[in-house]
Design a protein with these regions (language model features):
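C-terminal motif of bacterial Sec signal peptides marking the signal peptidase cleavage site
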Residues: 18-22
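Bacterial signal peptide processing site
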Residues: 24-26
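Flexible hinge/capping segments at coil-to-helix
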Residues: 30-33, 130-148
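Extracytoplasmic small-molecule ligand-binding "clamshell" domains
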Residues: 31-103
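Short loop->beta-strand "edge-of-pocket" segments that line small-molecule binding or catalytic clefts
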Residues: 39-43, 140-153
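Periplasmic-binding protein-like
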Residues: 45, 122-130, 193, 197-228
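Short helix-initiation/N-cap motifs at beta->coil->alpha
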Residues: 64, 79-92, 135, 155, ...
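A ligand-binding cleft/hinge motif common to bilobed small-molecule-binding domains
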Residues: 90, 104-113, 159-162, 182, ...
Length: 228
């Protein structure tokens, strides 16, 4: 039984006392086994509101709080390691870290490389953003023939590539998607709905417009080594 998967599922879905299954022991026994342990968690610290660095140089956000709560309930310490998004799964598979969290969508292709916890968040859609005043891009089909800015290695990038765009500009950081739009380097940017909303609510609405959405039911989960 995958201990990490049991752990994540217990916190995320049940909201009950976290239990790590171990040698048939009960939750308290399993918790005592993890007390004092340091778990290395890979993430890309630039995707608000899920995770980002605040004005005090602290890593914060929903996913950060989630892992800290898992650590609190088990007596373990979470040690975050910042790295590019497209390296997260390789870091887990190569056992450089114990887990990765970072709005990682569960896909069949990714399941060949790593295991996943139960989902902790369901994405309702991808947002299509354009520079304020530019023609709207309303849906997935209208990406055809457009220059699209997307996050490197993301499922949103894969969705955009499937629509025969003129060009995909792959960005290492989500904020670079917004900068590319503002600079006129891309016709449209694609990102998760909550990330787009956060940008628009924190000053982006003066420069960018939400012009369309792509419905989806992608699930985010914690990536874990298949050997755990």
């Amino acid at each position: 039984m995958n201990n990490w998967k049991k752990l994540a599922a217990a916190v995320i879905l049940a909201g009950a006392v976290v239990m790590i299954q171990g040698c048939g022991g009960n939750g308290e026994e399993a918790k005592s086994m993890e007390k004092g342990r340091v778990w290395k968690a890979a993430t890309e610290a630039a995707y608000p509101p899920f995770r980002y660095v605040d004005e005090n140089s602290n890593l914060v956000g929903f996913e950060v709080d989630l892992l800290k709560e898992i650590g609190r309930r088990t007596g373990a310490t979470i040690e975050f390691r910042d790295m590019p998004f497209d390296r997260l799964l390789d870091a887990v598979a190569g056992k450089q870290v114990d887990m990765a969290i970072g709005a990682i969508t569960v896909t069949k292709e990714r399941e060949k490389l790593v295991a996943f916890s139960d989902s902790y968040y369901r994405l309702s859609g991808y947002s299509l953003l354009v520079k304020k005043g530019n023609p709207p891009v309303r849906n997935e089909e209208e990406l055809a023939g457009k220059v699209v800015a997307a996050k490197r290695g993301s499922t949103s990038e894969a969705r955009a590539k499937a629509q025969n765009p003129k060009e995909i500009i792959s960005m290492d950081h989500y904020e670079d998607i917004f900068k590319a739009l503002e600079a006129g380097k891309a016709d449209v940017g694609i990102t998760g709905d909550q990330a787009a909303l956060y940008e628009l609510e924190h000053g982006g609405s003066s420069r960018l417009s939400l012009s369309g959405t792509i419905p989806t039911e992608d699930n985010f989960a914690i990536a874990l080594s298949k050997d755990n």
